[in-house]
Amino acid sequence: MRKIRTKICGITTPEDALYAAHAGADALGLVFYPQSPRAVDIIKAQKITAALPPFVSVVALFVNESAQNIRRILAEVPIHIIQFHGDEDDAFCRQFHRPYIKAIRVQTASDIRNAADRFPDAQALLFDAYHPSEYGGTGHRFDWTLLAEYSGKPWVLAGGLTPENVDEAIRITGAEAVDVSGGVEASKGKKDPAKVAAFIATANRLSR
């Protein structure tokens, strides 16, 4: 049986975290990127993680952050997986001795084809839409057909996903993990419970 896993990213409050967890999210993303409208600090992150039930993975998202700050956050917040969304290389990402996911901002098929060789130590790759000045959470999507024949390292689909299009996205790409942020929001940084539930329910329905 294939289980399509879901990550709800950009969680900013314990209430949103709890709702997503109870709706069946496999993972929740905390954004430690000050320029993001969904950014959290250590205090907020501690409150969110303290509210979570067992067996919900917490993912910390960083964008070109210093190693010193990353270590400080990892020491104070219970993080299971790190997601690097900037211009980090494999050597930088692996130094924290924590499973990591590397976001790949897709422009062409070669971005997908070369990703596994560039990040051999990544637990998984996350394919997201390219934007010249923003690192994720843009609401943009890329050409999903580029992933239709991909069979490399485990991967996650992101970029412009919503409750309305995640069905199509999974069918085209064969994704076994999907990541959403803006597509399930009432406003930037605030999740819409109905959208979160609908997104997860669709992914669960397509599991087999």
Curated annotation (Swiss-Prot):
Q: What is this protein identified as?
A: N-(5'-phosphoribosyl)anthranilate isomerase
Reactions the enzyme catalyzes? N-(5-phospho-beta-D-ribosyl)anthranilate = 1-(2-carboxyphenylamino)-1-deoxy-D-ribulose 5-phosphate
Q: For this protein, what is the EC number?
A: 5.3.1.24
Gene transcribed to yield this protein? trpF
Q: Which GO terms describe its molecular function?
A: phosphoribosylanthranilate isomerase activity
Q: Which family does it belong to?
A: Belongs to the TrpF family.
Assigned keywords, A-Z: Amino-acid biosynthesis, Aromatic amino acid biosynthesis, Isomerase, Tryptophan biosynthesis
Which pathway is this protein assigned to? Answer: Amino-acid biosynthesis; L-tryptophan biosynthesis; L-tryptophan from chorismate: step 3/5
CDD domains assigned to the protein according to its UniProt record, in alphabetical order: PRAI (cd00405)
Write down the InterPro entries for this protein, in alphabetical order. Aldolase_TIM, PRAI_dom, RibuloseP-bd_barrel, TrpF_fam
Q: Which GO terms describe its biological process?
A: L-tryptophan biosynthetic process
Kindly give the SUPFAM superfamilies that the UniProt entry links to this protein: Ribulose-phoshate binding barrel
Q: According to the UniProt record, which cysteines are disulfide-bonded?
A: none
What is the organism of origin for this protein? Neisseria meningitidis serogroup A / serotype 4A (strain DSM 15465 / Z2491)
